[in-house]
Amino acid sequence: YKDSRDVQSTEFGRFIPGITMVNEITKIDDVVMVPWLVGNEWKKVGKMKCKYMFGHFELPNFFMNAMVEMPDTGELKGSDFVAQEYVFSGHFHKRQFKNNIHYLGNPFPHNYADVDDDERGMMILEHGKEPVYFNWGNCPKYRNVKLSTLLDKTKEIMKSKMHLRVTLDIDI
């Protein structure tokens, strides 16, 4: 499944009017859309000149979530993207930026792998302008907390849509 685009969850989209499925690397004017990379496609992506590149990249030294950094596999790296003004990628849950690369992140935290990572929401990009990020202030939040801290600061810690993993550090 990692070496093919034959089976994917978005395939149903081709039957919806107004949606175009991009299943091959596609350039339209100054925009390049890159589906899941297979084979040696990663070798040509960084050299493709464009203003905007959108992809589903697994770049080393970026965090997949709030705790786990993507290891270097010896393939595509952030430093390979020298011919693009902006590179936007999905795939990783954490919103983050390095140089011209923007990982958009998920619109909301999903589980305890996203502890303390509240910069979630959406991004709007108007062609020719800077991307604008919006945080969803009322998104679900995940926290790890000691019971003693929770008891001392209950009102500060417990908020709407707060998921708490409580560690027992005192006798109950």
Q: How would you describe each model-predicted region?
A:
Residues 1-172:
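Extended recognition/assembly regions associated with phosphoester-bond processing machinery
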